[in-house]
């Protein structure tokens, strides 16, 4: 992102310059002075302008051989909370640059950087202080929500994360999710030079006052054995610059180390797959235990991700011919069952489990639960999570699975997960016709999950054996999970 602010960056020595960017660039208090540093190798001249000098060109910055411009102010010249920018000249033209490494931006216009003197705990000290040494890398069922989507706050910058934890933690535990994925954390501002809205990747929405609040949110989640992921992505306009790679590596480490975040969920590949591959490798090199997953994408593992986590409605499109709300609820339940047991992970967007997607800036929609179908589906989502996580047979087959096969036949989707100690078969009715199917494999089978039975819709599934052959009968849009016992 910021490497492209001034001209083309081809041929620069980005990695050696920018590694350690957050600790070096931006506004940092060092002894009796506050140093301001920005990377702009092709600039002709750079000035530090801000509320401390009337936004005038009185603080000329000096450039080193690496392309980093620097100036320093005494502690009496700049105060905590002062706004500032970099005024950069190139070919006689000036542009104003918001500091890419600032931890806060102007709350009124989201445009000026704000100087803050903040000291973070290291990841080790964070864990030690909060007694948080649990491993949250095993991601199974994730609940995704926006920070301004659960509390009825009119201003998203005023989110109280401790109150948010009080509201959402009991619900997440009740529903059986293993992780939360938070979106909408980053401040945004309008970049007039590029005529678009830009994320401030180091700035938490709400500024410095919310940093301790977010750390407490993570602590409360960890105490309840819930992992914390954040929605994270590199700017879509980049793709390949070495300085950009180092910058976003540092940004990922900033969130992982300073806030106790357990992992990153990357939903956009628009900055380029090769750039993402290098980025994931770079972060993993610094933090081997960092969990980085893609929100979708079959090639995520090839890019170095720790797999992907599909949205719970991702399989809904394979179901055909739904004509009623009851059929849609049954199809949603089957889609979620099929996805979770086939992929091993699932991401539920807030509101999906109650039959209604969450509106940005709106609190949790309890009215959605006023309908019987939506209430049934919410109960089903909880039962699905707990069945997948707590059933010993499912857990062993999930953990030791050495092959997964998928096929569609006669309007059915059949998923097999085979392991040395057993086999799971997931069968879903895609066409809503219902009917009876023969399980060709010999042996004895046990039905351990029946979607329509949990929903209380249709006749549920029936497993029967005749003359050594096992038959499964499903009602319309039903799904069942079978465990081979012998």
Question: What would you call each of these model-derived segments?
Answer:
Residues 21-23, 344-424:
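Glycan-recognition and catalytic regions of carbohydrate-active enzymes
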Residues 384-385, 437-462:
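C-terminal accessory region downstream of the catalytic core in glycan-modifying enzymes
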Residues 1-35, 56-144, 152-156, 163, ...:
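The feature marks proteins involved in alpha-glucan
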Residues 141-142, 186-224, 236-258:
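Aromatic- and acidic-residue-enriched carbohydrate-binding clefts of CAZyme catalytic domains
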Residues 137-139, 146, 225-226, 238-346, ...:
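Alpha-amylase-like alpha-glycosidases and glucanotransferases acting on alpha-linked glucans and related
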Residues 166-187:
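Catalytic domains of carbohydrate-active enzymes, especially glycoside hydrolases
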Residues 80-81, 461-486:
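C-terminal beta-strand-rich structural cap/linker in extracellular carbohydrate-active enzymes
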Residues 32-35, 42-44, 403-440, 480-483:
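Carbohydrate-binding surface patches
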């Amino acid at each position: 992102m910021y490497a492209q602010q001034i001209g083309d960056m081809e041929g620069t020595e980005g990695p050696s310059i920018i590694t350690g960017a957050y600790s070096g660039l931006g506004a940092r208090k060092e002894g009796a002075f506050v140093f301001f540093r920005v990377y702009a190798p092709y600039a002709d001249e750079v000035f530090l302008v801000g509320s401390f000098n009337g936004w005038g060109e009185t603080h000329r910055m000096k450039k080193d051989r690496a392309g980093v411009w620097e100036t320093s102010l005494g502690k009496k010249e700049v105060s905590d909370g002062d706004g500032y920018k970099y005024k950069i000249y190139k070919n006689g033209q000036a542009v104003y640059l918001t500091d890419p490494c600032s931890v806060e931006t102007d709350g009124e216009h989201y445009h000026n950087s704000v100087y803050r003197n903040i000291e973070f705990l290291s990841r080790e000290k964070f864990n030690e202080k909060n007694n948080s040494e649990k491993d949250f890398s095993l991601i199974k069922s994730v609940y995704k929500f926006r920070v301004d989507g659960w509390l009825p706050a009119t201003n998203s910058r005023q989110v109280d994360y401790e109150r948010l934890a009080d509201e959402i933690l009991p619900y997440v535990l009740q529903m059986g999710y293993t992780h939360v994925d938070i979106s909408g954390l980053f401040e945004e501002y309008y970049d007039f030079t590029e005529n678009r809205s830009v994320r401030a990747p180091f700035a938490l929405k709400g500024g410095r006052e919310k940093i301790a609040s977010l750390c407490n949110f993570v602590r409360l989640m960890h105490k309840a054995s819930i992992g914390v992921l954040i929605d994270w992505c590199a700017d879509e306009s980049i793709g390949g610059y070495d300085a950009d790679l180092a910058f976003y590596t540092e940004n990922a480490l900033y969130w992982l180390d300073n806030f106790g975040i357990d992992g990153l969920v990357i939903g956009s590949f628009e900055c380029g797959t090769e750039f993402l591959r290098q980025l994931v490798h770079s972060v993993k090199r610094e933090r081997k235990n960092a969990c980085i997953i893609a929100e979708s994408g079959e090639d995520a593992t090839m890019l170095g991700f720790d797999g992907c986590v599909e949205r719970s409605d991702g399989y809904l499109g394979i179901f055909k011919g739904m004509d009623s709300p009851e059929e849609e609820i049954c199809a949603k339940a089957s889609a979620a069952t099929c996805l979770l047991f086939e992929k091993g992970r699932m991401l539920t967007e807030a509101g999906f489990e109650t039959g209604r997607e969450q509106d940005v800036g709106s609190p949790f929609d309890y009215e959605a639960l006023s309908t019987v179908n939506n209430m049934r589906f919410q109960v089903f989502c909880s039962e699905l999570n707990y069945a997948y996580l707590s059933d010993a047979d499912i857990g062993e087959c999930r953990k030791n699975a050495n092959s997964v096969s998928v096929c569609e036949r006669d309007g059915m989707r059949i998923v097999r997960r085979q392991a040395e100690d057993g086999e799971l078969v997931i069968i879903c009715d895609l066409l809503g016709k219902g009917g009876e199917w023969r399980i060709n494999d010999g042996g004895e089978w046990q039905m351990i999950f029946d979607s329509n039975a949990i929903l209380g819709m249709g006749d549920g599934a029936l497993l029967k054996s005749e003359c050594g052959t096992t038959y499964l009968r499903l009602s319309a849009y039903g799904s069942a999970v079978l465990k081979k016992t012998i």
